[in-house]
Amino acid sequence: MKHLLGEEYEDYLKCYEEPRHYGLRVNTNKISVEDFLKIAPWPLRPVPWISNGFYYDGDQIQPAKHPYYFAGLYYLQEPSAMTPADRLLIEPGDRVLDVCAAPGGKATELGAKLQGKGVLMANDISNSRAKGLLKNIELFGIGNKIGRASCRERG
């Protein structure tokens, strides 16, 4: 790694000493950001580059055990992982393909951007991971989807 990063190697090592960033992304298919902030059961801080992304204190709370999580009001996702789907210019009516889609972080955001129009095809090579992907897509209320797991062997 030192060879690859060169003079940035020391900064790379320092990042492991920093506290972890916990994030969640509001499902705008089910609730507006404004309405979610009114009912949020814990303090949230905005992720500056993601309009529906927020930081939370993961050392103090467990949002994966809250009823809002099971209602599909938000998706737990590291803030930097929110960026790719956010930056794609997806419009309602588009046809979108997400390969290596499990567990569904990008797919749920892409599906929300479609606003019930167009089609989202989410694919993963692993059947077990595809089950989690489909669960998350269902939780998010994405109706215009095609889920698929490839059964082809790698190697």
Predicted regions and their residues:
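S-adenosylmethionine
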Residues: 1-154
